């Protein structure tokens, strides 16, 4: 009896120790706004009048991890409890861990899970609904994702088919309007349901509709959204779907190269896909891929916030719109020591000297060098990079 009591006590202590460490799974949802789509208001559930705070709580329950006691009285890590849909192009979620994610040079830093899979017939395609990842450093230290965002430049970032600063606006529908069924597709019961307009460079794609299908009867407009319109701006990838049947019955969404959520089957260190070649997997995401708004690579020693948005504006017949799904996330090295951030070390070489002054001056003149630290260039922390930062940097050197 005493032996069993001791074993139970040790088990409890080990469980508490595990919980006390930095957790590898997502722990916080800061923001969520889906674009209209067939899974909106069901992933997660939402009804008219729901407050956004309650929606964020439901999203946390769906994609943030936790520990639960299993049948043997042990605390078991649940890191992929459910899934959410981001809807059509632009829908996004902003998440974080209970610690900053450290940029480990040359390594994959974190994973965001989707539900992509490969077709047994088409090896480089199947279900691929790519989402772009952005990261942010909490420069002002207020614990909120209100600092600049940096896109993780995936394989398609520099493609001539990728549109940056793409903007789309969706217009709230009249749910009681007369429906317009698609004469060529009986599954589409209203092909003028939710109107959208955009600044697409393709004249044929400036405007269109989110269709309503016969499989999902609820409203496709996010019920917690305020106002009559929803607007999103970001990078947009080219469409990736093909009707391989030629008659609308079999659609294949082809994988993008790398660097996108819900694009390929995911590498999962806690449940590895031993039956898949690592070359066809989404290995994860590197903070080293971060670029600024002008596409210049930047060095972020760590990040506090992660944002995922649906990167394509595409409709696939009876399958409906292409909508990125998010099913949780993990930090590959949650207990990595936080790097020392030296004030004024704008080029990240560990030393504050005249080369940092030169970098800040060039930054002010619009000449941003590859690999600069976008947080450190604002030496005095006033949110503006100007001559006062040069003065502050010189004072640091002279100390």
Tell me the role of every PLM-derived stretch.
Residues 8-15:
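Bacterial N-terminal signal peptides
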């Amino acid at each position: 009896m005493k032996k069993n009591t001791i074993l139970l006590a040790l088990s409890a202590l080990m469980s508490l120790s595990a919980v006390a460490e930095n957790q590898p799974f997502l722990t916080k949802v800061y923001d969520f706004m889906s674009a209209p789509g067939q899974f909106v208001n069901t992933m997660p559930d939402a009804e008219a009048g729901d407050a956004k705070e309650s929606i964020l709580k439901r999203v946390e329950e769906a994609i943030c991890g936790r520990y639960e006691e299993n049948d043997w009285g042990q605390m078991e890590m649940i890191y992929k409890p459910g899934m959410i849909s981001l809807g059509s192009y632009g829908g996004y979620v902003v998440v974080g861990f209970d610690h900053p994610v450290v940029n480990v040079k040359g390594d994959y830093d974190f994973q965001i899970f989707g539900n992509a899979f490969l077709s047994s017939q088409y090896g480089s395609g199947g279900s691929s609904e790519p989402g772009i990842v952005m990261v942010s450093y909490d420069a002002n230290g207020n614990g909120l994702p209100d600092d600049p965002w940096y896109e993780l430049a995936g394989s398609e970032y520099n493609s001539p088919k990728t549109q940056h600063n793409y903007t789309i606006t969706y217009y709230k529908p009249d749910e009681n309007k007369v429906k317009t069924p698609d004469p060529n597709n009986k599954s589409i019961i209203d092909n003028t349901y939710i109107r959208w307009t955009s600044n697409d460079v393709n004249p044929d794609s400036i405007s269109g509709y989110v269709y309503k299908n016969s499989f999902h009867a609820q409203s496709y407009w996010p019920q917690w959204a305020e106002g009559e319109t929803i607007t999103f701006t970001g990078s947009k990838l080219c469409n990736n779907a093909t009707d391989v049947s030629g008659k609308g019955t079999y659609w294949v969404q082809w994988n993008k190269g790398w660097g996108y959520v819900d694009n390929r089957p995911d590498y999962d260190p806690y449940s590895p896909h031993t039956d898949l070649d690592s070359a066809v997997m989404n290995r994860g995401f590197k903070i080293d891929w971060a670029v600024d708004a002008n596409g210049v690579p930047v060095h972020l020693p760590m990040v506090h916030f992660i944002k995922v948005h649906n990167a394509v504006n595409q409709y696939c017949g009876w399958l409906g719109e292409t909508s990125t799904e998010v099913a949780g996330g993990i930090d590959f090295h949650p207990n990595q020591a936080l790097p020392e951030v030296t004030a004024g070390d704008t080029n990240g070489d560990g030393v504050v000297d005249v080369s940092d002054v030169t970098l800040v001056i060039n930054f002010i003149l619009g000449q941003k060098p590859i690999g600069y630290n976008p947080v450190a260039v604002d030496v005095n922390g006033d949110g503006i990079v100007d001559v006062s930062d040069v003065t502050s940097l010189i004072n640091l050197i002279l100390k």
